[in-house]
Design a protein with these regions (language model features):
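Loop-centered beta-sheet repeat module
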Residues: 77-117
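Glycine-rich anion/phosphate-binding loops
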Residues: 1-8
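Hydrophobic faces of well-ordered beta-strands that scaffold small-molecule active sites
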Residues: 17-21, 76-79, 96-98, 127-133, ...
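Structural motif
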Residues: 12, 91-92, 227-229
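Short, flexible active-site-proximal loops enriched in glycine and acidic residues
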Residues: 12-22, 53-61
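An alpha-helical appendage that flanks or caps ligand/catalytic pockets
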Residues: 34-66, 106, 111-226, 257-270
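Conserved, mostly hydrophobic/aromatic
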Residues: 9, 48, 76, 89, ...
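Glycine-rich, proline-tolerant flexible connector loops at the mouths of alpha/beta enzymes
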Residues: 25-28, 100-103, 233-246
Length: 270
């Protein structure tokens, strides 16, 4: 069904569809199930990509094909943090989605990704990088209040990581804050003001999110770009969404577009 929907949308949009996919966190946990395995995720990527691009596949013992599909390539972006996820992304994906707005952590993850690409026999830089995080333009104290849910959300993935890998394989700036966590209620997942975020302090909120004045946002987005980010995806679910979009559309995106154009001109001149 996912492949068919993507193939239809490719036809409607002239090949503009990308697939963003992960192991499933809240969608499965509210059903009492854990996230799916990395092996299942990798298999799903292959099946969906083949079907959308018009190739026949064998899935659960049956040969499947979308005979009308295949005009377009399907870029696949994988959401993940752990060594296994990064290795798989470096092996098969076109993009990596990191739910973080911390340039230093992004830089660490990008380095791991580049090593995974080379280990898989691909040129370093084959996989693009997206940072996904809440952004709130305005007073920092108000922004913290509206976005504190996000480090709490990310903590679910961090807890999975520290339960699976030795802590010395992961940055302390990623894992340290979950020591104070006592639990997480998925019925209040990604909810502004939820008690889920009671353990989250200002420092980690400032690092993981994009807060402050328009100039603060521009500065941090430039830091993310310098750390290896190709795309920034705003989690626009903190209130005052229309006002936030107006500021981004009127001030922040044009400034970033100008900076990107200047960087491109500089590279061309060299």
């Amino acid at each position: 069904m996912t492949a068919s929907a993507l193939a239809v949308l490719d036809e409607v949009t002239g090949g503009r569809m990308d697939l963003g996919i992960g192991r499933g966190d809240s969608a499965r946990r509210v059903l009492g199930k854990p996230p799916t395995s990395m092996a299942t995720l990798e298999e799903a990527i292959g099946v969906i990509r083949d079907l959308v691009e018009g190739r026949a596949v064998t899935f659960e013992g049956k040969e499947l094909r979308l005979p009308w599909a295949g005009r377009w390539k399907l870029p696949v972006w994988v959401a993940g943090y752990g060594p296994m996820a990064l290795a798989m992304t470096g092996r098969v994906a076109d993009g990596l989605i990191l739910q973080l707005g911390d340039p230093d952590l992004i830089r660490w993850f990008v380095d791991q990704l580049r090593q995974a690409e080379v280990a898989a026999g691909r040129p370093a830089g084959s996989v693009r990088v997206q940072a996904a995080a809440p952004a709130h333009v305005g007073e920092i104290a108000e922004g913290r209040k509206r976005t504190r849910w996000f480090p709490a959300l990310v903590s679910n993935h961090v807890v999975d990581l520290v339960n699976k890998y030795p802590r010395d394989q992961l940055p302390e700036s990623l894992t340290g804050y979950v020591r104070e966590r006592t639990g997480y209620d998925y019925h209040h997942h990604a909810e502004v003001g939820s008690d889920n975020a009671g353990f989250v302090g200002d420092e980690v909120t400032d690092r993981f999110c994009v807060l402050g004045s328009p100039q603060d946002h521009i500065r941090k987005l430039r830091e993310l770009a310098a750390a290896g980010v190709d795309q920034f995806n705003i989690y626009l679910m903190n209130g005052n969404e229309e006002e936030q979009l107006e500021v981004y559309g009127g001030e922040i995106i044009p400034a970033m577009r100008d900076a990107t154009a200047m960087a491109s001109d500089g590279r061309a001149a060299r």
